[in-house]
Curated annotation (Swiss-Prot):
Organ and tissue specificity: Expressed in the vasculature of leaves, roots, inflorescences, siliques, anther filaments and sepals. Detected primarily in the phloem tissues, including in the root ans shoot apical meristems.
Transmembrane segments: 1-21, 29-49, 91-111, 123-143, 177-197, 210-230, 268-288
Known function: Involved in the glucose-triggered developmental leaf growth process.
Entry superkingdom: Eukaryota
Keyword line: Cell membrane, Membrane, Transmembrane, Transmembrane helix
Topology in membrane: Multi-pass membrane protein
Protein's name in the database: Protein PGR
A UniProt-annotated Pfam family: DUF92
Source species: Arabidopsis thaliana (Mouse-ear cress)
A GO CC term assigned to this protein in UniProt: plasma membrane
Length: 288
């Protein structure tokens, strides 16, 4: 099902406006996040319905999971906001790289959806692989964080495997890692299913597209692990005796748990997404 860029642009503006407004009203995004969300969603859907679907699956599932167990998260997360209320920085950290890759890929393909096929174009395959890795990482990290904190299991610091308090950057649980794997799988399935309607491949190439699912699943897990390693090493975590919570900045009432104060959560997310996108793009060229 091939559609013109003009039609996709009109559709993109309408659907992006509705979702951004709804998300703002439901406090999933603040005003700046709503504006940024509208822009990146418009870019994705104009580029292709499959790219828009990847962004939408990540955003909608993550927003839903953010609201699960809010009372428990409020007691643990020092930066807890009802509904999430993500701002423009968070939106761009989680979709900026993909937006650039989407525009480059579509410019090279004449704004047509293409299958992963290195024989046809290694560059386009690498770009599409990077987009898949991007959202697998975003989804994996978010599902892992939002569901892992609800687990009754004691988190362990990924670098030392020592037990740490919930909310500690770099703390992992089995439930969180399984959630990351499931999140990556969801992204892969979305890419594959929408591709049935938006891209046409030769039979041998079409069969290989099934490998997107395990690739995306591993990208979700890998992205979550990279995020955890960065969080445990170059992001500060300490326990505040006054607030009785894990905090991300040193202070007179804060006892250090792990990490040095180099990057904040947005910085860690950005770097982990960048690395996962790069690794997935390279893997895609060799696999497809």
């Amino acid at each position: 099902m091939e559609t013109s860029p003009q039609f996709r642009l009109i559709f993109a503006v309408i659907i992006s406006s509705l979702i951004a407004f709804r998300s703002y009203k439901r406090k999933s995004l603040d005003l700046s996040g709503g504006i940024a969300g509208f822009l990146v969603m418009t870019i994705h859907f104009t580029a292709g319905f499959r790219y828009g679907a990847l962004l939408l699956v990540f955003f909608l599932t993550s927003s839903k999971l953010t609201k699960v167990g809010e009372d428990k998260k409020r007691r643990v997360d020092v930066e807890f906001k009802e509904g999430g209320q993500r701002n423009w920085v968070q939106v761009l950290c989680n979709s900026g790289i993909a937006s650039v890759l989407v525009v480059i890929a579509c410019t090279l393909t004449g704004w047509k959806d293409k299958c992963l096929d290195s024989k046809q174009s290694e560059i386009v395959t690498a770009l599409i692989g990077g987009i898949i890795g991007h959202y697998a990482c975003c989804n994996g990290d978010t599902w892992s964080s939002e569901l892992g904190v609800l687990s009754d299991a004691q988190p362990r610091l990924i670098t030392t495997f020592k037990p740490v308090k919930k909310g500690t950057n770099g703390g992992v649980t089995k439930a969180g890692l399984l959630a990351a794997l499931a999140a990556g799988t969801t992204v892969g399935l979305t890419f594959l299913i929408f591709g049935l309607f938006t891209a046409s491949c030769a039979s041998d190439v079409a069969l290989k597209q099934l490998l997107v699912i395990p690739l995306s699943a591993l990208a979700g897990l890998c992205g979550s692990l990279i995020d955890s390693i960065l969080g445990a090493t170059i992001q500060f975590s300490g326990f505040c005796s006054v607030r009785n919570k894990v905090v991300g900045k040193p202070g007179p009432t804060v006892k250090k748990i792990s990490g040095v104060d180099i990057l904040d959560n947005n910085g860690v997310n950005f770097v982990s997404i960048l690395l996962t996108s790069f690794l997935t793009s390279i893997a895609s060229v060799y696999i497809f």
